Amino acid sequence: MCGIVGAVAERNVTAILIEGLKRLEYRGYDSAGLAVIDNASIVRERRSGKVKELEAAVEQAQVNGHIGIAHTRWATHGAPTQDNAHPHISGDVAVVHNGIIENYEELRTELRAQGYVFVSQTDTEVVAHLVHRELEKTQELLAAVKEAIKHLDGAYALGIIHASEPERLIAVRQGSPLVVGLGIGENFIGSDQLALLPVTNRFIYLEDGDVIELRRESITIYDRYDSVVQRDATELDAQLHHSDKAGYRHYMLKEIYEQPQAIQRTLEGRIQESGLINEQAFGGNAAEIFAKVKHIQIIACGTSYHAGYVARYWFEGIAGVSCNVEVASEYRYRTSILPADTLFVTISQSGETADTLAALREAKKQGILASLCICNVPTST
């Protein structure tokens, strides 16, 4: 899963961007990059490999800027190379992107016919060229972004800057997570709040279709109908959110050794000593709903998928309920038949895995009995 960080501030934002990327490393990635505006020019550094390699390059080049965007990439379109790393640039426009542009091949063909040259294999470069094309028509960045996204099919989150606008960052959320962090005289965007906790604990959780205009002293949110809207800010306890490795060599080792405590914390407050569930933890009528379950469908990706297979043994061996486990990326694209008495269980560390969310949306269309989502981020989608 990729990660986005963006900042508009009076101070140099490069350290904020790098620290944000480090705090998103738990998502996994194969390359990283950032871009800032300095003296009306875009300064970009990208590296395949670890964020620390990008950090060294940024320090050596003495990159400095009061506005910038950064990204960790997990390759989907194109190999994990420096040329494919974000941000991508078209003219004076720089873009970072999470998600998948499903019609990128058609857009690439169209843009090539209009004279645009592609230097990467990514779907993201299409977005940069689209914004540049629309900017040539409108001469206004916000209007250009709004027009460009009308051509995009898929799920995406975007962060966009323009060299001539050192005080404004444009962001978009459509089917891929993005939050706004609120500071004092500075504002931020991130794929999740973990990336921004060193600089703020006040967040606005965006909705699909939102286009956001960030300045140092203000933010403006336009909804899917292009109306200006106000969204409530949430204040988080930073102590409750940890992304460090706690002395372990890597996150996998940390998570392996944390399993006993994680299981205990998960059960506490949800299962009573009598063995009955605490309905308040699962929502109203939970016991009645669970009693009606005759089949369980588990959907997940990666190691969450492996955890789902462990759960299958428990559901069938202990509860005596039939259970099926499937990879979300396979499930969402096939025609599936679910019994009406199915409990649809999704597992996602971040609560934002795109394929898992898409699978859940498809299942809800079928009229399942209920859904149960297991994740580490209560404020996620």
Which sequence ranges carry the predicted segments?
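Conserved short alpha-helical segments that host acidic/polar catalytic motifs at enzyme active sites
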Residues: M1-K245, R249-H250, E258-K294
